[in-house]
UniProtKB/Swiss-Prot annotation:
It is found in: Cell membrane. InterPro entries: NADH_UbQ_OxRdtase-like_20kDa, NADH_UQ_OxRdtase_20Kd_su. Coiled coil: none annotated. This is NADH-quinone oxidoreductase subunit B. GO terms for biological process: aerobic respiration; electron transport coupled proton transport. The gene is nuoB. The lineage of its organism: Bacteria, Bacillati, Bacillota, Bacilli, Bacillales. It comes from Anoxybacillus flavithermus (strain DSM 21510 / WK1).
Length: 177
């Protein structure tokens, strides 16, 4: 098996060449961190935090047509049971401390998806005195999904990108910004 340019060869006693070839095809070697990341990436539990129009599109992802459950994601209503916060809609300065409190109540590891133009950059209300110019000013964001509003397929794509990010960070040990 080759990993990062290093060839790993296992020498076993009393094993025939045929058995060794069978083991190479059927034995999977990994690290515990990669195994945990694989499990976490395939069982994301998003906290629904709908603030505006994008929330309606987010609800569509849970319907039978898109069926987010088939990807191992189940919407949770409590931050203590969630590991992904999906912020969909305009975040006002009055709502900002509540968003931060919900984020702080989530257990580690935790991730944030900013869904829609309003959550990512303030949207059409960006010049208003009471609108936060992107949820990344309150909590760290892992995935941005553009659109006004983004369709459910875009949210599924964003969730899949988050899964890839989780696995990549565990494999390389590098934080992806």
């Amino acid at each position: 098996m080759e990993e990062e340019g290093v060839k790993m060869d296992v020498k076993l006693l009393n094993v025939s060449d045929q058995e060794m070839e069978e083991m190479r095809r059927n034995v999977f070697l990994t690290t515990l961190e990669q195994l945990k990341a694989w499990a976490r990436s395939n069982s994301l539990w998003p906290l629904t935090f709908g603030l505006a129009c994008c929330a309606i599109e987010m609800m569509g992802v849970g319907s039978s047509h898109y069926d987010l459950d088939r990807f191992g994601s189940f919407f949770r209503t409590s931050p203590r049971q969630s590991d992904v916060m999906i912020v969909s809609g305009t975040v006002t300065k009055k709502m900002a401390p509540i968003v931060r409190r919900l984020y702080d109540q989530m257990p580690e590891p935790k991730w944030v998806i900013a869904m829609g133009s309003c959550a990512t950059a303030g949207g059409p209300y960006v010049k208003s005195y009471c609108v936060v110019k992107g949820v990344d000013q309150i909590v760290p964001v892992d995935v941005y999904i553009p659109g006004c509003p983004p369709n459910p397929a875009a949210l599924i794509y964003g969730i899949n990108k988050l899964k890839e990010k989780i696995r990549y960070e565990a494999k390389t040990g590098k934080k992806v910004l």
